[in-house]
Regions:
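Conserved beta-strand signature within the Rossmann-like core of class I S-adenosyl-L-methionine
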Residues: 133-143
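Arginine/glycine-rich "motif VI" loop of SF2 helicases in the C-terminal RecA-like domain
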Residues: 128-134, 174-178
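Short, flexible loop/turn elements at secondary-structure junctions
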Residues: 104, 111-113, 189
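Domain-level recognition of nuclease-like catalytic cores that cleave nucleotide substrates
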Residues: 143-216
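Short beta-strand-loop-alpha-helix junction that forms the active-site gateway
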Residues: 108-117, 146
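Active-site metal-binding core of divalent-cation-utilizing nuclease and nuclease-like domains
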Residues: 52-54, 64-103, 116-123, 130
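Glycine-rich, often proline-containing surface loops adjacent to acidic residues and nearby aromatics
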Residues: 101-108, 137
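Nuclease-adjacent, charged terminal/linker segments that flank catalytic cores
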Residues: 1-69, 204-216
Length: 216
């Protein structure tokens, strides 16, 4: 039984939304405050032409727009220190940083990375869920059909098929990549695109001087 009916209709008109193991139901009942903030951030987001064309460096303006919405609501990037103890011997079990974490919700943004980042995210969710550190994982990525917009803006080569998008994500989830962790995914669709004109010089320069980041 799906619990996607708990996702507001306006979000389903803007994003492709899918769930694994009733993730929407888990968010609604176990993490209502975090769920409300996810809805707020995703409702406010728009995919701006100026940011698509200005995108550069190691973290794009698009990623910063979404991450910034969560950080403004006191979500934080987090690295969990995990280990397995057998008798008196401790085995380190390192995890990767989670982009946005609050309560018991882990959220990853994969706008335009190499697709193995999905494997990393799902393995992280699986481990953290099995260790009872999180109740649910959320991934925000892009819909594959945005490629037509990128091509029209001369950015098609920057968003190849082997980068992170919805069609690359779901075979991994259905193949068990996230284990038993409930996972909710949002894919940014053309319905969110706004042609606000080409980027200003300030936007271009701002994209070029961003500090080194692992996510784009």
């Amino acid at each position: 039984m799906s619990t996607l009916h708990l996702v507001p209709d306006d979000l389903k008109q803007l994003y492709h939304v899918r769930e694994w193991r009733n993730a929407a139901g888990v968010l609604t009942t176990a993490c209502p405050n975090e769920w409300a903030e996810i809805i707020e951030v995703l409702r406010a987001f728009r995919l701006l032409r100026s940011e698509v064309q200005a995108a550069g460096g190691n973290k794009s303006p698009i990623a910063r727009q979404i991450d910034g919405g969560f950080y403004a609501r006191e979500w934080q990037e987090k690295k969990f220190e995990t280990a397995i103890k057998i008798d008196d011997e401790v085995f380190e079990s390192p995890t990767h940083k989670v982009d946005c974490y609050k309560g018991r919700v882990a959220l990853e943004l994969e706008w335009n990375n190499k697709d193995p980042f999905f494997d990393r995210d799902l393995n992280n969710f699986r481990l953290l869920f099995d260790l009872r550190a999180i109740d649910v994982g959320v991934i925000v990525t892009r819909a594959t059909e945005l490629q037509a917009i990128f091509k029209s803006l001369g950015k098609g080569s920057s968003y190849g098929y082997s980068t992170t998008h919805h069609q690359q994500l779901w075979p991994r989830i259905e193949g068990g990549g996230g284990g038993g962790c409930p996972i909710l995914t949002f894919a940014i669709t053309p319905a969110l695109y706004v042609d606000d004109g080409p980027p200003t010089m300030a936007q271009i320069e701002g994209a070029q001087v961003q500090p080194d980041e692992s996510k784009s």
